[in-house]
Amino acid sequence: MPKNKKRNTPHRGSSAGGGGSGAAAATAATAGGQHRNVQPFSDEDASIETMSHCSGYSDPSSFAEDGPEVLDEEGTQEDLEYKLKGLIDLTLDKSAKTRQAALEGIKNALASKMLYEFILERRMTLTDSIERCLKKGKSDEQRAAAALASVLCIQLGPGIESEEILKTLGPILKKIICDGSASMQARQTCATCFGVCCFIATDDITELYSTLECLENIFTKSYLKEKDTTVICSTPNTVLHISSLLAWTLLLTICPINEVKKKLEMHFHKLPSLLSCDDVNMRIAAGESLALLFELARGIESDFFYEDMESLTQMLRALATDGNKHRAKVDKRKQRSVFRDVLRAVEERDFPTETIKFGPERMYIDCWVKKHTYDTFKEVLGSGMQYHLQSNEFLRNVFELGPPVMLDAATLKTMKISRFERHLYNSAAFKARTKARSKCRDKRADVGEFF
């Protein structure tokens, strides 16, 4: 959709004045040269058509199109806020598709730019819209609403405002997660949202324990029964169980030591059964969760002893060198890469350090807790993760990065290295990486795959 910022200027009063989304949409449609007699609330088709004729402020995709380029232009903060006001109005539209698009547009904007003051003033309105869409919406709309709730809490950070959001939305999210008749995709997104919002906002230990129990009741349904000796077959519920397990693992990292000990006793001997699931994503989620549990256990007791270590390492080694012809090559490569690291963590207490670069800064991920936390927020924020690592005080506190670094354009320019120096650095890094990977690579893993 073309960018029509200047065309919107004369009509700003019509949408910001709270006259209703339908009136704003109809006015914008007339200004855009459409001479039809549009009735936005007559039915869903009319409402969708109205939205398609709205000027730039109501087009959620315009955030993705404009991106950082728009945010660098003069006066763009006002334009961005004007677009967001229009999208907030459209969350009340009668059309489900219009509401969903508006929710996604707001989420994309909040994921790509810090707008703390703007949403602080409108947090109650946004919370009401999310609550309404979660209660009355269907699958895609509920997913969009839950995703927006996560980003909203990330923007606000820990505090009374986020606590109020969790207090309002928490019971609804829990109800959807446990509702067997609800869409599986919606339940999956709500499980992730519930974990993220609780991680950020909860200040009540009983509420934290209640959330852990809710998530446990979901993913433990994938555990093998005592009499079962066969492989766990994936079901439509597997995606929900994966999201619940990952959200549960995230919350476990902020639990008191006594609670962590209880959870370790409950799950340490049952969680390995998920490694036999025929879904590669479940196997990977279970493996990474096990590595994190070992890290927590050894952090509490340096001489921690696991009784079934031999059988567990055999299972992990088999997954790290899996050559099963009945599995996709991409899945096998992904699985082998992950389980080589998991095996090293369990056997040698080792973690392969990763470096995340954002702007002029670097962050080193040197433990499973940090990796899991980063992966969770990366899943929620997508491409906006790097921006939030630079600007979001909450995330910088989580990853111990200190206050945001404020650098002007001239300073940034002097920090850049020349192309030749960058080439030398990349060549050396490539050579070192190749040597390191060749040591870990199992050269026999792919033998026989093409026969």
Swiss-Prot record:
Assigned keywords, A-Z: Developmental protein, Differentiation
Keyword Protein biosynthesis belongs to the record: no
PANTHER family linked to this entry: INTERFERON-RELATED DEVELOPMENTAL REGULATOR, INTERFERON-RELATED DEVELOPMENTAL REGULATOR 1
Gene: IFRD1
UniProt feature coiled coil, ranges: none
GO CC terms of this entry: nucleus; sarcoplasm
Any one of the GO BP annotations: regulation of transcription by RNA polymerase II
UniProt entry tagged with the keyword RNA-binding: no
Tissue-level expression: Expressed in a variety of tissues.
Biased composition (Polar residues): 49-61
Name of this chain's protein: Interferon-related developmental regulator 1
Basic residues biased stretches: 1-10
Subunit structure: Interacts with PSIP1/LEDGF.
Pfam families: IFRD, IFRD_C
Region named Disordered: 1-69
Family assignment from sequence similarity: Belongs to the IFRD family.
InterPro entries: ARM-like, ARM-type_fold, IFRD, Interferon-rel_develop_reg_C, Interferon-rel_develop_reg_N
Biased composition (Low complexity): 23-33
